[in-house]
């Protein structure tokens, strides 16, 4: 699966484009990085790719997954996963039930669903935490659980919005490795926005600076 941006730009109503038009190809398992100052439109770009662009903004150009233009599709049809800087888990669900929320619809049997979640928890280093209250997890554990929930939905591409910015240095390094390894192993194209050059270096993919690149 390849993610392609072809002359993509976002313009507010009555205004000028937030950033120069972007053309970029992200290969399977590759993490491309978008950098730039606050307010330039990094998160708005991700909203546009995911199909969540706010009213009052216009998208130009095209967004393609495996050569198919997904720009006209609603968010649920795009199957683009999102990972945010705040690892949001539903407080009324256990850790395991949070992950089960992300399972693809074709997986219906209770035993099959439970096994898939337990396997995901194991890969995330969260064995035995199925019934745990998510409020008791550490920041790193919450982030890993949130990523596994996203991956259980089998996204065709992944968007990362400052996913490591609220973690301390040690946790940040660990979660970077965990996240990028899963992206590469599953051959998912990913696009990350960040302020941190260390994130871009660890991603080891194309880098777009919205202040200069098009």
Regions found by a protein language model. Give the residues of each.
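ABC ATPase NBD coupling module
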Residues: 68-84, 105, 110
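Hydrophobic anchor residue at the start of the ABC signature
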Residues: 147
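Catalytic Walker B motif of ABC-type/P-loop ATPase nucleotide-binding domains
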Residues: 158-162
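A short, proline-enriched helix->beta-strand linker immediately N-terminal to the Walker B motif
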Residues: 152-156
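Short helical segment in ABC ATPase nucleotide-binding domains corresponding to the A-loop/adjacent helical element
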Residues: 96-104, 114
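Conserved ABC ATPase "signature" region
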Residues: 111-129, 180-181
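Conserved ABC ATPase signature
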Residues: 133-137, 141
């Amino acid at each position: 699966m390849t993610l392609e941006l072809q002359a993509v730009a976002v313009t507010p109503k009555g205004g000028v484009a937030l950033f120069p038009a972007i053309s970029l190809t992200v290969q399977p398992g590759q993490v491309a990085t978008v950098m730039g100052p606050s307010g330039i439109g990094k998160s708005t770009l991700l909203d546009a790719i995911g199909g969540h662009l706010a009213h009052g903004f216009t998208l130009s150009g095209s967004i393609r997954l495996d050569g198919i233009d997904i720009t006209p599709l609603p968010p649920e049809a795009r199957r683009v996963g999102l990972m945010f800087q705040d690892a949001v888990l539903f407080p009324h669900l256990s850790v395991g039930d949070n992950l089960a929320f992300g399972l693809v619809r074709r997986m219906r049997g209770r035993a099959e669903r439970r096994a898939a979640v337990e396997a995901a928890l194991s890969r995330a280093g969260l064995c035995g935490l199925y019934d745990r209250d998510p409020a008791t997890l550490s920041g790193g554990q919450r982030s890993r659980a949130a990523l596994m929930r996203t991956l259980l939905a089998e996204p065709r591409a992944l968007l990362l919005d400052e996913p490591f910015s609220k973690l301390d240095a040690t946790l940040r390094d660990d979660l970077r490795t965990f996240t990028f390894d899963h992206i590469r192993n599953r051959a998912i194209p990913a696009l990350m926005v960040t302020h941190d050059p260390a994130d871009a270096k660890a991603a080891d993919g194309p880098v777009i600076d919205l202040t200069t690149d098009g």
